[in-house]
Amino acid sequence: MLEVKNLSVSYGAIEAVKDISFTVNAGEIVSLIGANGAGKTTTLHTITGLVPAKSGSVMYNGVDLLKTHNNKIVTLGMAHIPEGRHVFTRMSVEENLEMGAFSLKDQSDLKKDLDMVYGLFPRLKERRNQKAGTLSGGEQQMLAMGRALMSHPKTILMDEPSMGLSPKLVKEIFSIIRKLHEQGITILLVEQNAKMALSIADRAYVLETGRITMEGDAKELLNN
């Protein structure tokens, strides 16, 4: 489904990602773990066209993403939940969710899609008319996830969903990630919280200073 091959990314003279290769197969949760500054977010930004690659390839269901404009990538069935949530703070919860459906040609199922998201995140339904900027960090993370689901993704790239959340909320968010996986959504999960990420992933890659240093079955890495 997603194949990253010999990918290198630089910011000027600084090499952020150094010749990494990994795959995400349909139906998997694959985790990319590592410390802050390891190159995890840069990797996601390159996959989704926000940062140019220096070399390498990124193929998604036969499409070369490095040659695809970033506003077209969502139409291929890929959604990106960025680090820090990035909700539209002055818009209501429901308006934020509706923004997630902007790429869909057929808007006739909008209400059904909203009901689906509200079923997963009852708190968002309670706050649907509330400004997104007034939500807690956990609620904003739920909103970012719900907004991504509105585009009917086959694959979701999640960047640090646990960042800034209490342990209780982290468990809640990861429980929802499991539910999304059970619905058949493929997930590439970037996390500093290695224990939580490995506990739900099928496979994982460890990124250190821009290079993949370990890879394998998530449970085996968890016990390493």
Model-predicted regions and their roles:
Residues 1-224:
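Glycine-rich phosphate-binding loops of nucleotide-dependent enzymes
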